[in-house]
Amino acid sequence: MSLPATFDLTPEDAQLLLAANTHLGARNVQVHQEPYVFNTRPDGVNVINVGKTWEKIVLAARIIAAIPNPEDVCAISSRTYGQRAVLKFSAHTGATPIAGRFTPGSFTNYITRSFKEPRLIIVTDPRSDFQAIKEASYVNIPVIALTDLDSPSEYVDVAIPCNNRGKHSIGLVWYLLAREVLRLRGALVDRTQPWAIMPDLYFYRNPEEVEQQAAEETTSTGADAEESKEEVAEGQNEASEWAEENTEAVSW
């Protein structure tokens, strides 16, 4: 697929994809994923062509941007590593997120409270989100999926080849997809300027680590407050001593 020069993969984005291990695929290769294999390492790990990954990100972004109502796009992730990325993607693009367990019948049973009629769905893993893909096939909803080399491609219309097992890889692909959608919609006009949002915002964070970090910040804040109180008390003592000395001098 030939793209205009403005859609070419930049060295900065290529470095991001490599740093996030997006190019590290599975050892097994599904037949439809063979065109995306760059080479195979001696340890048996297949390397994904990041140029193909970028082309599919651009294609998926153009499909998403073509839908007039952003809420008609449904971003889905039942995998833990992709839930934060799905929520951030939806917050930035206006899509409808489904983070966590997908309720069966959400696309086919209009009686359920979670019933939705999206025009497009994006899933993080065809294996974990198989229920959403299956129901989408019943009601003719196009499917965009982040696929590894061994992922099933049945009922998937646009496959973005990437490492969909790593938390950094998943977050980065969702980040690049959101950025490209905003560029096509005109929210980000200048392609030469970096997006103000950092990719780290899309990465999964362990709740225990977040709580530990918050506790450390609270402890440091409390220590700083105690130090400031001690400094204030020392200043007050010095001021009172100085006032007493002046009072004695005046009385004398």
From Swiss-Prot:
GO molecular function: structural constituent of ribosome
PROSITE patterns given in the database record: RIBOSOMAL_S2_1 (PS00962), RIBOSOMAL_S2_2 (PS00963)
GO BP annotation list: ribosomal small subunit assembly; translation
GO cellular component: cytosolic small ribosomal subunit
Positions carrying N-acetylserine: S2
CDD domains in UniProt: RPS2
Keywords annotated in UniProt: Acetylation, Cytoplasm, Ribonucleoprotein, Ribosomal protein
Family assignment from sequence similarity: Belongs to the universal ribosomal protein uS2 family.
Subunit structure: Component of the small ribosomal subunit. Mature ribosomes consist of a small (40S) and a large (60S) subunit. The 40S subunit contains about 33 different proteins and 1 molecule of RNA (18S). The 60S subunit contains about 49 different proteins and 3 molecules of RNA (25S, 5.8S and 5S). Interacts with RPS21.
Name of the protein: Small ribosomal subunit protein uS2A
Lineage: Eukaryota, Fungi, Dikarya, Ascomycota, Saccharomycotina
GN (gene name): RPS0A
